[in-house]
Amino acid sequence: MDLRDFYLLAALIACLRLDSAIAQELIYTIREELPENVPIGNIPKDLNISHINAATGTSASLVYRLVSKAGDAPLVKVSSSTGEIFTTSNRIDREKLCAGASYAEENECFFELEVVILPNDFFRLIKIKIIVKDTNDNAPMFPSPVINISIPENTLINSRFPIPSATDPDTGFNGVQHYELLNGQSVFGLDIVETPEGEKWPQLIVQQNLDREQKDTYVMKIKVEDGGTPQKSSTAILQVTVSDVNDNRPVFKEGQVEVHIPENAPVGTSVIQLHATDADIGSNAEIRYIFGAQVAPATKRLFALNNTTGLITVQRSLDREETAIHKVTVLASDGSSTPARATVTINVTDVNDNPPNIDLRYIISPINGTVYLSEKDPVNTKIALITVSDKDTDVNGKVICFIEREVPFHLKAVYDNQYLLETSSLLDYEGTKEFSFKIVASDSGKPSLNQTALVRVKLEDENDNPPIFNQPVIELSVSENNRRGLYLTTISATDEDSGKNADIVYQLGPNASFFDLDRKTGVLTASRVFDREEQERFIFTVTARDNGTPPLQSQAAVIVTVLDENDNSPKFTHNHFQFFVSENLPKYSTVGVITVTDADAGENKAVTLSILNDNDNFVLDPYSGVIKSNVSFDREQQSSYTFDVKATDGGQPPRSSTAKVTINVMDVNDNSPVVISPPSNTSFKLVPLSAIPGSVVAEVFAVDVDTGMNAELKYTIVSGNNKGLFRIDPVTGNITLEEKPAPTDVGLHRLVVNISDLGYPKSLHTLVLVFLYVNDTAGNASYIYDLIRRTMETPLDRNIGDSSQPYQNEDYLTIMIAIIAGAMVVIVVIFVTVLVRCRHASRFKAAQRSKQGAEWMSPNQENKQNKKKKRKKRKSPKSSLLNFVTIEESKPDDAVHEPINGTISLPAELEEQSIGRFDWGPAPPTTFKPNSPDLAKHYKSASPQPAFHLKPDTPVSVKKHHVIQELPLDNTFVGGCDTLSKRSSTSSDHFSASECSSQGGFKTKGPLHTRQCNSHSKSDNIPVTPQKCPSSTGFHIQENEESHYESQRRVTFHLPDGSQESCSDSGLGDHEPVGSGTLISHPLPLVQPQDEFYDQASPDKRTEADGNSDPNSDGPLGPRGLAEATEMCTQECLVLGHSDNCWMPPGLGPYQHPKSPLSTFAPQKEWVKKDKLVNGHTLTRAWKEDSNRNQFNDRKQYGSNEGHFNNGSHMTDIPLANLKSYKQAGGATESPKEHQL
């Protein structure tokens, strides 16, 4: 109903006339170009047939049949059961339907059709007139894309020149409505003149004076528009040529001329002679005749115009029936200004040249051109509808219709020129079995023309034979999605009887609810829309029964196969497919199968699958739907993949559908737990003895990147808790104290914690070491870390919770043995040396002493050079060791901890942190005169105890400290050497200082200026870690250039590598409190020498830059008693006395030590790594920032002025020339004795 309301402009206009209650007329109005199946009208509703049925008491079902010629393509169709009128697939084009006709009004374009209503008891003949309204389906067009106009240059302003008008096949408001001059110039304008016939002619107006010499051509665009919706338009190029002057224009004698010419006029017949005059002379008076642009192309084809004479002639045969009136516009132009215009109307008169036409349309369907009637059929049985027509007009078009000979049939007039063929009397089969007669149609022209149509009628006998179907099994095929009332086939049966006995009635059997069968004709139609997906085949029976008495019948099987159409899109079994695969699935493994169905058949159900979204991670088999992976899955990187799958069938056009696919990657337990806390396997937690049971003493925390149970972690202590002192929460990882610590529990406890996930079928685990130090305080951090390092060599299954004390006792025993052995060796060496010295002759000693005394008092450069030459010739001892402290210790068998036996190389930051930590105690004053020569002092310390004192409350280190300090002759004095790696000095400087790492603990009180190492971090709160300085293996304290002190002596101590702690902790006592306001220095009193005197070094052992070498002597200069000479003695011993070289056994040179790093800790960039333990277990070392280490190593505790050297802060200087006791700034006691290290 909506479509009808939309397209149908007017429903039922009128019921024009009823003739004998059987002829009625309906008028409908529709738009052209309607699509198929648009309802036009409803015959029973519009005629109110249901009321008529009720009045007459008729209850039989009515059949509506469109009466049409065989082979015609109907523009409309009529439902046989409902009487509804619909459009067909044949497009109704108003311009084509009414081509060549001139209509004053839009509604004059129409077509007619007839519909009969059966059965005969309620016969109706319905004449339907359908008026076709115009739609704007054509754009107006100019006759040519380029329009040329010539205008004289002397044309006056506002002169008008006609422009060929555009044509539009549409009519009314859909036709040409408006002209517009585009990109026109101000020289011209445009005006529209409307003719009495309603045509619109454009005219070009000259708005400015023209000058051909300045510009002879103007090119513009002209646009034409119609008034339809949507509006259509077109454009053309308008080219104006300015021509030379021509004063007078041609003039027609008659502007409007009307002529008549018969339609049978031969070719060449003159229609009219036009004549125009021109007042000019010569060439300006030459007139040329042309057709105007408004002349239709069909008219130009029928008539010819002589361009010179103006004669119009017939050039093709005329047909009044096609076009009765031709309007011709003729222009007369002399090539100058506006041409003259004349309109010629040519009326084509009719002649009787067309015979009548008979349109015979059967009401009773003929069989092979023959109408079968029963001999008992009543009178006035309607056989056919006959329509006669003649294309001629007036008398020539008046037609009469009659039957040629006497037969029991007659024609009954229904409308003008329309008749019904009926039986005029009862039929007698026994009298005549068959009738064949002609229907004649004749016009009234002179001479008269006629037309005939042959009608065959056969009568049927009594019923003695049953009807027989032509085919016992009728097989049909029909496409699904058909329309209701679709004609399928005509089921026919024959009966050898005649008359009533041969009148066959068809009836459907059971299981035929989808079909309608015409009882009379056997026309089988579809009463419903078929759906092949619901039912593909219908099998039912059709019964043909005659009207005999008794009636006879027969049956035929009808098999209707429904053909498939692609009306079903592929359907996925799920709108969203979800597949679950395990991670680490190999590449090209099957992930899942996409299932899709299509209810169609054949190619329409051939489904092809494809992946959308350009997903390259998966491969989809387009036919089987198997999804295979193109990658290996890793759930930790991506847990799911989502893409769309498209299914396309093979129909035309193809149909498709999509579904969503999600690939969920199931977790596989392929990741071990990762320890977050503790940050490393070498950190520790302090457990005070006052801790109460149940308190948390440490926290173990780990994460697992897997999910589900694979990420659920369980914490257990697998080793190190044999006493049951600690308990770990299996869920949180918190380590709590089970019972209050006893004194026997004091020490380092190593707990091996196993962190395992709950993965199935295989659980993964990680081991981590948790060190708990049970004590009231953790004052000596280096001691604790040394214990931790020792435990790294211990198998994980061994308990070391109380192993610190045995290590300590063992170290004390080792130290004592080493001290006793060292003392015995020194005593033996001294004894042997004394014996060797005593062998020298007294005479040789006296002479040498006299000579050396002279040089002592007044040394000269020449003697020094000579002695240097002698010293070069003589093999001097190469075994003298540089002044250094050697610390030997054993490290774990680790890639990071290598055995260390070498000299400590301190970076700049360690120097800054270490120097100034300790006071050296009172410095003895020098006893040498100013500018006196400096005797080399030889040191040999083989004391069984270290050369420095430990505070009583300092715990003894578990390391084995073996300290040996040697000062050979050539390395006694420290000069301003730039390269510290030389480990020797070439000149004297003002001050002697020494420093060590955690093992030495030496510190000066004044600020020192040290070299900087760029690789060190300057952060105060970061533990000092070893970094490589590019050019130094030791440390060196620079000289204060502005020092006002007198010449002094500097002694530099080179310590072997081995400290693993920064200088924040001496390693020999308690650590300094963090944030202490004042620096706590540990005085390091030097051990008094065994005797008051010392031996002087020979002058030839000194370097050129040597100065005073005895800042500590307090007695007058003079030789001491000479001991017995040894084989190592020289002549200098007679004067100066014996030196250490006389009795010193050969040793390692100062450079013959292995180079080792300062610390066994890995650099910061290597702090996260795996360490292998003794038993093969792997520990995760994640050195971040250990709170314990930071507690002991915070650089802030050293004061803000550390590491800077300026004029305002001086080092402690000891004048060499002052013979009095020197008192340090710290107020230490005086000491005139020599301090021996």
Curated annotation (Swiss-Prot):
Membrane topology note: Single-pass type I membrane protein
Glycosylation sites: N48, N148, N306, N307, N347, N368, N450, N511, N630, N681, N734, N754, N775, N780
Basic residues composition-biased segments: 866-877
First and last residue of the signal peptide: 1-23
The entry's keywords: Calcium, Cell adhesion, Cell membrane, Glycoprotein, Membrane, Repeat, Signal, Transmembrane, Transmembrane helix
InterPro entries for this protein: Cadherin-like_dom, Cadherin-like_sf, Cadherin_CS, Cadherin_N, Protocadherin, Protocadherin/Cadherin-CA
Name of the protein: Protocadherin-9
Organism: Homo sapiens
